[in-house]
From Swiss-Prot:
Cysteine pairs bridged by disulfides in the record: none
Protein's UniProt keywords contain NADP: no
Keywords, ordered alphabetically: Coiled coil, Membrane, Merozoite, Transmembrane, Transmembrane helix
Subcellular location: Membrane
Organism: Plasmodium falciparum (isolate 3D7)
GO CC annotations, alphabetized: membrane
Domain of life: Eukaryota
Designated name of the protein: Uncharacterized protein PFD1115c
Biased composition (Polar residues): 375-394
SUPFAM superfamilies: Methyl-accepting chemotaxis protein (MCP) signaling domain
Length: 1612
């Protein structure tokens, strides 16, 4: 700045001199005339002035021109001051200059006489040269000042105070950061002092020559030198790394001065710490970039590998001393070999680092050594540093040199030097000398692990010691990110991933909330590396140990919960991060981990992805505030009642549609258009654009007026109604009077409008022409008076248009905004009226002429409004349809079989919505896509399950333009339709309409298809009760169109539960959701029917062959009828089946007197079913209509979804489908064995994934076996064997079934590379496989009755396991003869024998499965892995480990449950005055653990895995525990007394019926928690009488079966 000031002064002086020169030139001409007169007077003055001028002129070259000019000015002023007292200062200045130049010229004039030429000539040259220099300097200064002003322009800022405050804050932050760097740099002294103190203490105390390592206290100094100074890094490698980073950053940027400073510091690394007043990030080598961090990590890896490859190490092992020894050895090797240092090529190639010796060998400069000597006395004897190769072990002579150059020698030397300072005595020196004689320690894995654990712990402590000294949050975040990057590079082989997660957890607690997004961004960048290292640790280091896998996963879950809390606390909440963290869990954790199965699945975390949707709405729509009307609030409150929503919508459309369309919707629609098209423009730009559009529209309307006038005249002539016209003429006269009054008001407006509107000036020319025409009209008034009668007739034709006119005029007067479009028309009309005021007699004629003009204008206006109203009506109706669609998607359970007609309403609403979407213009969509704000906002609605946000008009207008949202919405509708189709059985696979639609082009194959349908109906695997109303085949894959991947239609359940006309059973899962009391009645009906069916099934096999023959004869007769009349009406089929069913039941009742009551109930139900079938005749038309609607609905949806090119929605499809399936499994309170998993295949658009099909129903319940065998059957039937007899067909079927069963597990092989969604799908498969494998284990091994009574075991297996043989016997009695039945029974016996022979295989599987499930339940109980983590000490053997594993479940968990009981007792005792908040009952963790412990002790492990949870009510569980312990004790007492003596006399049928009754009573107790004890006491009396006939093993006495408890209770 000083230089600038000096240059500015010089510039001023130069400018003054130039001005003086110009003035002097003008004066010269005047002075030449008076030369002779001035000679004598001024000769004396010339010599004096010359001397002064020469002196001043010489000084100007060295000094500033300002001072010289001032001196001359002062001297001249002083001399002339006495002469000219009264004159001004400026005149004196001019005169002095004139005198000076006059003297010069007089002197030159006299040169000829005196001979003083050379001196004056030289003086003139100097003057000219000075002028040239002045000009150059002036130009240079001018350029410099222009550059300065261009670079440092001052901004016109109104709020200077705010800028000053922000500048002050920035300065404070910079000062804080600088102080933090100073603290970090000055921390070296602290680490060195601690190292000296600890080393002296340890060396003097531990004198014993044992093989134990002393704790190393030199890590802090070592880490400081490495991480902050970079002492041990190679110079060339570091320079090359910094160059790479600068190349990446400065590809397009120019090098600035700061960057030059950085390059200089990178060249002189050793001199960084000597810089003063530059405590920046360049002092810390961690912040040099990722390449320098990679060098640091490579050095640490090399050092740890070298320690591992050593043979021996001293007991007093210090890393600093070890590094110094390595460097001394490398120096000697360098002298011998004299190798040149290699150039660092790639820091990421770790293989080359092991091969090249000097790649990691670090040679320091002499400057570094001097610095270390001055700073650290430890490095007084140190020289240049190098590293050692890991691959080459040390030879024997070098080991001897190592033992001679032990670290103790160095320590003794240092102690002798610092004896006076530290106060060391001779005794201490003797002790340290004795330590030299200690034995060396051989390195083992155990010792190396200790060194490595100490390394990790010291590294962690070093990190946090540095972080404690930091106060600025930015710098703290930067340290955390860099340190976590270093730990990530060192994992999993050098830093254990458990320790890494612990470090990350500590970082997560420390990091500030505002900067949490940067920390998560680090994981987003390094996601793949983190997952790879996690899996490498899992497979290579742990070797897939289930206990350790669960514990590590639990810690990772804890870390992610910490981050999620920080995200929720942040004001600028971004739910994308929480969604990312949950997906990272789903990819890291294995499929079998409990945290992945339970809560951290992607299924339950999609709402985190769009949690800030409301915030976005409030931010983006500041002008249009989101305010919910009463209509919207009513919809939100009544969203579950579809009928109420329908009535509200109808009421709104009928009553408030006009108000809404005219007032609210027009404003909102215009605002939405403008916001979408011009988002960034202000209010002014929007107003201007509206005006431009209005003027364009007015120009177009004038051209169309003539055409519309002609059309109106024609319509007027056609609509001549004389009676009505006379009445309307009277009304027109009244209206004309009103119009005259309005003209007066309009005249005033015209005067104002002429001043305002600039565009009317252009139209004055047109108005003048019209005025000329008006003058002609005045002359023709007399002629027109005679023709008034003709005009009145014409007016009557236009009365229909006048009615529209009056309505529009009222709107024009009230709404000035609408008049802006038509101001030009009104002004023209006003001019007509102003000229005709005087002629009152001729007013009628003028009015009639004016009416024609106005009607033409108004008709155009009404047409425009009609178009706008059309748009608003469509938008409004589409909004109403959108609400109904959203309600339909959110709660599909509303629609039942009684309310199927509501599907038509949904379809109509879909049509209106789709038509509105297709009618939107492409330009608006493109403009909308360009706006990033709205796109970011709309992403919030893709997976959002909440409706409250969607029920708003403003948001609806935005969502309509987004294709992603529409894709999601239409796919959700498709899923709901298929869901309802599965449940309500609307569209079945082979209806006549579908066959016709699919086989239009295949007329030749119709007969073959009919035959195949008949054959398939003969070979159905369902019971006789499962016959359809429509007579269709049931087991073919659902294929209707080539897009069959989306159309998963109904395949009737192959279970024994559904009956023909039982509406309660069809819709019990839907009605069960309504009320809990209604659930009980449903369960009673279900279980009565199950008990009756089980009795029928048991009697069917034990009876004689007479019943079977009767059944076969009756069914053969029926099947002959069905073969002939396959495509007939449904009523005949129903009647025939029902009558035959009656006869069969009567035959069974004659043989079995025990089951009379049950069979009577069934007959009573079947008579009701027949009546219900007759009632179905009235509803048959409705069903056909709904079928057509469903097919068209699904086709339109699929056509829309196929229009999208992007395949990103495949992930979304899997999520949505799985959500509805799991929703049904978990929410439906239904104790049946129905197969709810639908065989659903996804369409793969990507070419790489064409062959993949995600099947959910590969391994569900046993019903899938029937599905798969049925597909087998159909494949065989479609071959050339269709001409064979029915008997041969049956034989092939049975052979296929028996051979097919063992091949089922082959389909469950999982691929290696699975997506997170595919892992979610596989969870269900894994747990269902466990259930399947455990059923035969219990049936064959647990019950003693089975081993004794083999004949009765068959029936038990057939009922419990639902074997295929029973289904075949009951369903295919149409064709089976006695001989064939014998063959079937032989196959059944073989199957049962095979299951009994395969007990060893089941036992082997169970041993593994048992361990698998135990590990899952362990993590349920305590995620910290308190009891089940094994000790790491070497003393434990494998046998002890196995024993401890067994004790975990049996002893420790039960003891833990007893402790929980005691805590509840303490809470409930009135003596102990404990507040409710402090009670352990209210702790959610306590509730969770108690429920899981309860399940482990009292309920079987393997029945809970899939979808059966328990309550967390502590008091309820406590009462159940007490009652169950009493029951167990009573059972033991009964068994010990030997009450049960005759095991063979037990009836299996009675046994089953009693168990079903128990289940009914216990399942009724789900909602009655208060009366649990009373109901269980009543249960005891019944169980004591019933359980006398039961014998079980002692293990089952401890663990009760799940039938004794209500299982389907959901967690609160």
């Amino acid at each position: 700045m000083n230089l600038l000031r000096k240059k500015v002064k010089n510039e001023k002086s130069l400018s003054t001199l130039l001005i003086n020169e110009e003035e002097n030139k003008n004066i010269e001409m005047t002075t030449l005339k008076d030369k002779k007169e001035m000679k004598n007077e001024n000769l004396s003055k010339i010599n004096v002035k010359k001397e002064n001028h020469d002196k001043n002129h010489d000084k100007n070259h060295d000094k500033n021109h300002d001072k010289n000019h001032d001196k001359n000015h002062d001297k001249n002023h002083d001399k002339n001051h006495d002469k000219n007292h009264d004159k001004n200062h400026d005149k004196n200045h001019v005169k002095n200059n004139v005198e000076y130049y006059n003297d010069v010229f007089t002197h030159l004039y006299n040169c000829d006489d005196g001979g003083e030429e050379p001196k004056e000539y030289s003086h003139k040259k100097k003057q000219v040269n000075n002028k040239k220099k002045w000009k150059k300097q002036y130009k240079a200064v001018k350029l410099y000042m222009n550059m300065f002003l261009n670079n440092y322009k001052l901004k016109k800022g109104k709020g200077n105070c705010k800028n000053l405050s922000s500048v002050k804050k920035r300065r404070k932050k910079k000062k804080i950061i600088q102080n933090d760097y100073i603290r970090i740099i000055n921390a070296e002294k602290e680490y060195v002092q601690k190292y000296h103190e600890d080393k002296i203490f340890l060396d003097n105390i531990k004198n014993v020559s044992s093989c134990e390592l002393i704790k190393d206290c030199s890590y802090s100094v070592f880490f400081y030198n490495l991480f902050i100074k970079g002492l041990y890094l190679n110079k060339q490698n570091l320079e090359h790394a910094t160059e790479k980073e600068h190349i990446q950053k400065n590809i397009t940027k120019n090098i600035t001065k700061n960057e030059l400073h950085i390059n200089k510091t990178s060249e002189h690394v050793s001199n960084i710490t000597k810089l003063k007043k530059n405590y920046n990030k360049h002092n810390v080598i961690l912040f040099k970039g990722k390449y320098t961090r990679q060098l640091i990590c490579d050095y640490l890896k090399f050092l740890l590998n070298s320690i591992q490859n050593e043979h021996t190490i001293k007991a007093h092992f210090y890393i600093l001393d070890y590094v110094n020894d390595l460097e001394n050895k490398k120096k000697e090797m360098a002298k011998k070999i004299k190798m040149e240092s290699f150039i660092f090529t790639n820091s990421n190639e770790e293989d080359k680092l092991c091969k090249d010796i000097i790649l990691n060998c670090n040679i320091l400069n002499e400057q570094k050594e001097d610095d270390n000597k001055s700073d650290n006395p430890l490095y007084s004897n140190n020289n240049t540093l190098k590293e050692q190769n890991t691959s080459t072990p040390l030879p024997s002579h070098e080991i001897q040199t190592e033992s001679m150059n032990s670290p103790n020698l160095l320590n003794v030397k240092n102690m002798n030097q610092t004896k006076d300072d530290n106060g060391c005595t001779k005794e201490e020196i003797i002790k340290s000398n004795n330590l030299m004689k200690t034995y060396d320690i051989k390195i083992n894995e155990h010792i190396y692990n200790k060194i490595l654990n100490n390394f990790i712990s010291e590294l962690k402590s070093f990190f946090f010691s540095i972080l404690e000294k930091i106060r600025s949050s930015k710098l703290l975040l930067r340290f955390i990110v860099t340190l976590s990057e270093i730990c990530l590079i060192l994992t999993p082989h050098y830093v254990n991933i458990i320790n890494f997660i612990e470090i990350l957890c500590d970082f997560g607690h420390i990091i500030p909330i505002h900067y949490i997004s940067h920390f998560i961004h680090f994981f987003q960048c390094n996601k793949n590396i983190f997952i790879q290292k996690y899996k490498e640790f899992q497979h290579c280091i742990i070797n897939n140990d289930p206990i350790k896998i669960q514990s590590v996963g639990a810690r990772l879950i804890g870390f992610i919960k910490i981050l999620q809390k920080k995200i929720h606390l942040n004001n600028n909440e971004q739910s994308m991060y929480s969604f990312f963290l949950n997906l990272l869990l789903s990819e890291c954790l294995p499929i079998n981990h409990l945290g992945f199965c339970n809560r951290q699945s992607a299924k339950n975390n999609f709402h985190y992805f769009f949690q800030e949707s409301l915030d976005c709405c409030y931010k983006k729509f500041k002008e249009e505030q989101i305010l919910y009307d009463n209509f919207e609030l009513n919809i939100q409150n009544n969203i579950k009642n579809y009928k109420k929503i329908k009535t509200i919508i109808e009421h709104e459309i009928e009553l408030n549609s006009d108000k809404y369309l005219i007032k609210e919707e027009d404003e909102n629609f215009i605002s939405a258009k403008n916001v979408i098209s011009d988002e960034q423009d202000g209010e002014d730009t929007l107003y201007k654009k509206r005006k431009r559009e209005e003027f364009k529209e007015t120009s177009l309307t004038k051209k169309k007026q003539k055409k519309k006038n002609d059309e109106i005249k024609k319509t007027g002539e056609e609509k001549k109604k004389t009676g009505e016209e006379k009445k309307k003429t009277g009304e027109e006269k009244k209206k004309t009077g009103e119009e005259k009054k309005k003209t007066g008001e309009e005249k005033k407006k015209t005067g104002e409008e002429k001043k305002k509107t600039g565009e009317e000036k252009k139209k004055t020319g047109e108005e003048k022409k019209k005025t000329g025409e008006e003058k002609k009209l005045t002359n023709d008034v007399t002629h027109l008076t005679n023709d008034v009668t003709h005009l009145t007739n014409d007016v009557t034709h236009l009365t229909n248009d006048v009615t529209h006119l009056t309505n529009d005029v009222t709107h024009l007067t009230n709404d000035v905004t609408h008049l802006t479009n038509d101001v030009t028309h009104l002004t023209n009309d006003v001019t007509h009226l102003t000229n005709d005021v005087t002629h009152l007699t001729n007013d009628v004629t003028h009015l009639t002429n004016d009416v024609t003009h106005l009607t033409n204008d108004v008709t155009h206006l009404t047409n425009e409004k009609y178009i706008e109203e059309k748009d608003t009506k469509e938008m409004y109706l589409s909004y109403m349809s959108f609400i109904s669609l959203v309600a339909f998607i959110k709660y599909p359970e509303i629609i039942t079989q009684d309310n199927i007609i509501l599907v038509e309403d949904v379809y109509n609403s879909f049509k209106t919505f789709l038509n509105y979407i297709n009618s939107l213009e492409k330009e608006k969509k493109e403009n909308f896509k360009r706006t990033k704000k709205y796109m970011n906002m709309i992403k919030a609605y893709l997976f959002n399950d909440h409706i409250d946000i969607l029920a708003n008009v403003h948001i609806f207008k935005v969502l309509v333009y987004d294709e992603n949202f529409l894709r999601v919405l239409f796919f959700n509708i498709l899923v709901v339709l298929n869901y309802l189709n599965r449940e309500l059985q609307i569209c079945v696979k082979d209806d006549n309409e579908l066959d016709n639609n699919n086989n239009k082009n295949n007329n030749n194959n119709k007969n073959n298809n009919n035959n195949k349908n008949n054959n398939n109906n003969n070979n159905n695997n369902n019971n006789n009760n499962n016959n359809n109303d429509n007579g269709v085949k049931k087991n073919d894959p659902a294929i209707i169109s080539p897009r069959s991947s989306f159309l998963f239609f109904v395949e009737y359940d192959k279970n024994d539960d559904h009956e023909l006309g039982d509406p309660e059973k069809i819709n019990n899962h839907l009605n069960g959701l309504m009320t809990r009391g209604h659930q009980k009645s449903i369960r009673e009906n279900i279980k009565n029917k199950e008990s009756g069916k089980s009795s029928i099934l048991t009697t069917g096999t034990s009876n004689n062959n007479n019943n079977v023959n009767n059944m076969n004869n009756n069914m053969n007769n029926n099947m002959n009828n069905n073969m002939n009349n396959h495509m007939n009406s449904n009523n005949n089929v129903v009647d025939s089946n029902s009558t035959n069913f009656k006869e069969n039941v009567k035959n069974k009742d004659n043989s079995n007197n025990r089951n009379m009551s049950v069979n009577q109930n069934i007959l009573h139900n079947k008579t009701k079913d027949i009546k219900f079938c007759k009632e179905n005749d009235d509803k048959f038309v409705i069903k056909e209509k709904i079928k057509k609607i469903m097919f068209t609905f699904v086709k339109e949806l699929l056509n829309y979804l196929d229009g999208f090119i992007n395949s990103n929605h495949n992930f979304m499809l899997a999520k949505e489908y799985s959500w509805y399936v799991w929703k049904k499994q978990l929410n439906v309170a239904k104790y049946n064995k129905d197969d709810y998993d639908i065989s659903f295949k996804f369409k793969c658009i990507d070419e790489n994934i064409k062959e993949q099909n995600y099947d959910i129903n590969q391994t569900t319940n046993n019903n899938t076996y029937n599905n798969q065998t049925s597909n087998h059957m159909n494949e065989n039937l479609h071959t050339d064997e269709s001409s064979k007899s029915n008997n041969n067909q049956d034989k092939t079927v049975y052979t296929n079934e028996v051979s097919y069963l063992p091949n089922i597990p082959k389909k469950n092989k999982k691929t290696d590379n699975q997506s997170p969604v595919q892992t979610l799908i596989n969870i269900i498969q894994n747990f269902e496989l466990l259930n399947k494998k455990m059923k035969p284990f219990y049936c064959n091994n647990k019950n003693k009755n089975k081993n004794k009574n083999k004949n009765k075991n068959k029936n038990m297996e057939q009922i419990n396991n639902k074997d295929i043989t029973m289904n075949l016997c009951n369903n295919n009695n149409n064709i089976i003869h006695n001989k064939e039945q014998d063959n079937i029974q032989q196959h059944d016996d073989n199957n049962i024998i095979n299951t009994n022979n395969d007990q060893s295989s089941y036992n082997n599987d169970i041993f593994h499965i048992n361990n698998f499930l135990l590990e899952i339940n362990k993590i349920y109980l305590r995620r910290e892995a308190e009891f089940w983590e094994l000790d790491e000490s070497d003393s434990l053997t494998d046998e002890k480990k196995n024993d401890s594993n067994k004790k975990i479940l049996i002893e420790k968990l039960i003891d833990k449950l007893d402790d929980y009981k005691k805590k509840i007792n303490i809470d409930n005792d009135p003596i102990n005055e404990i507040e409710e908040n402090e009670k352990s009952k209210n702790n959610p963790v306590f509730k969770f653990r108690l429920s899981k412990l309860f399940i482990l002790k009292y309920i079987d492990l393997y029945t809970i895995v899939k979808n059966k949870e328990f309550t967390t009510d502590c008091d309820f569980l406590y009462n159940l525990m007490i009652q169950m312990d009493k029951n167990v004790e009573k059972k033991k007492s009964l068994l010990n007394k030997g009450v049960v003596e005759n095991d063979e006399d037990i009836n299996v049928e009675h046994h089953i019926n009693m168990e079903d009754e128990k289940n009914e009573k216990l399942n009724d107790k789900e909602g009655e928690y208060e009366d649990v004890t009373e109901n269980l006491n009543e249960q005891e009396a019944e169980e004591e009488a019933e359980e006398e006939a039961e014998e079980e093993e002692e293990e089952e006495d401890k663990f009760l079966t799940p039938e004794h408890l209500p299982i389907n209770v959901e967690i609160k």
